[in-house]
């Protein structure tokens, strides 16, 4: 179990460093900013690369919502859920701390949103709480459906990380304007701790919505995809 938790810690750490790091450090860098498209691909690439790297050790969740959805679908033992979530949140916090140290090394650095998730006046596009809630539930739901389907034993081996990485990229392309895209409570927690204030007060949504969407996906998969469940 220790090796699995280390893998989840490292994977989540890389996701936040690569994804949130691109948003904080490179999204609007003078003249060569990567923009929304670049940030979206950065998040997808972090999952793709780490899924190939440590997926064989822990399953490559890097996300409390993914762990919950897989547990509800019967893919992983529920007993490991709490340990996985702790490792994931710890990885996200450490990565956010490293990113903060790097970002504050710039003379004119301003914290701003620090890639934190938000709704209302803290939504990149000014979207309401309801819009943010629906977006996070729906996007996490489909993210889990894609994960559950692409990791099935009847699907050609070795391609799941590609499908999952591209799915996360697409999710970010759609939802960055709405919430700055969470679908991952650990990723949201790490950034919110350093922003404080409004980010912490709105953090509840970025736990409840992804976990709810993931749980529904697990239930749906057990019903719709029951015949395709892999052999343990």
Curated annotation (Swiss-Prot):
Motif (NPA 1): 63-65
Localization, UniProt: Cell inner membrane
Lipid bilayer topology: Multi-pass membrane protein
This protein's record includes keyword Glycoprotein: no
UniProt site positions, description: Selectivity filter: 43, 172, 181, 187
A molecular-function term among this protein's GO annotations: water channel activity
Reactions catalysed: H2O(in) = H2O(out)
Alphabetical keyword list: Cell inner membrane, Cell membrane, Membrane, Plasmid, Repeat, Transmembrane, Transmembrane helix, Transport
Short sequence motif named NPA 2, residue ranges: 184-186
InterPro entries: Aquaporin-like, Aquaporin_transptr, Aquaporin_Z, MIP, MIP_CS
Top-level division of the source organism's lineage: Bacteria
Positions marked as site (Involved in tetramerization or stability of the tetramer): 20
Pfam families per UniProt: MIP
Segments crossing the lipid bilayer: 9-29, 32-52, 82-102, 129-149, 158-178, 200-220
PROSITE patterns: MIP (PS00221)
Entry note about domains: Aquaporins contain two tandem repeats each containing three membrane-spanning domains and a pore-forming loop with the signature motif Asn-Pro-Ala (NPA).
Job of this protein: Channel that permits osmotically driven movement of water in both directions. It is involved in the osmoregulation and in the maintenance of cell turgor during volume expansion in rapidly growing cells. It mediates rapid entry or exit of water in response to abrupt changes in osmolarity.
Family: Belongs to the MIP/aquaporin (TC 1.A.8) family.
Subunit note: Homotetramer.
Name this polypeptide is given: Aquaporin Z 2
Native source species: Rhizobium meliloti (strain 1021) (Ensifer meliloti)
Gene: aqpZ2
